[in-house]
C-alpha cells in the first residue's frame, strides 16, 4: 500500500486522514499543497483515479473570484485553470496507487487495508 495524502497543514479533515492512517500503522506520504503543490503528472493521475478533475473542485473554497472564473471558462480551459489554482482543491486528496478519494472517506480507506 502506497498512500499519499495531499492537503494543507491547517485543514481539519487532512489532519483526521493522517490520524486515521497513523492509528492503523499504515505508512503514508503527506504532501502539503501550500508548500509543494501537485505536479502535473500527479494531478492527471489523481484526476484519472477519481474519475475526472471536476471531483477535485471545492465549491466552498475561499477564493470565490477564481471559483467564479472557473465556472465561466469553457471546458477545455477549466482543467488547466484548476491545476494553476490548487487552493480550489477539496482536501484531503488521498491516493493509493490507481485509487483515490477526496475528503475524509474512512469507509473507502478501510477496503484498502
Give the predicted meaning of each segment.
Residues 33-113:
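Thiol/selenol-based redox catalytic cores and closely related redox-interacting motifs
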Amino acid at each position: 500500500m502506497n498512500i499519499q495524502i495531499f492537503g494543507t497543514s491547517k485543514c481539519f479533515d487532512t489532519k483526521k486522514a493522517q490520524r486515521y492512517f497513523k492509528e492503523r500503522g499504515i505508512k503514508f506520504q503527506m504532501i502539503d499543497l501550500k508548500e509543494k503543490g501537485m505536479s502535473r503528472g500527479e494531478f492527471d493521475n489523481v484526476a484519472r483515479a477519481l474519475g475526472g478533475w471536476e471531483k477535485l473542485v471545492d465549491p466552498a473554497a475561499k477564493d470565490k473570484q477564481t471559483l467564479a472564473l472557473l465556472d465561466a471558462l469553457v471546458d477545455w480551459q477549466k482543467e488547466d485553470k484548476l491545476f494553476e489554482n490548487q487552493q480550489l482543491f477539496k482536501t484531503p486528496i488521498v491516493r493509493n496507487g490507481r485509487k483515490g478519494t477526496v475528503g475524509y472517506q474512512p469507509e473507502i480507506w478501510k477496503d484498502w487495508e
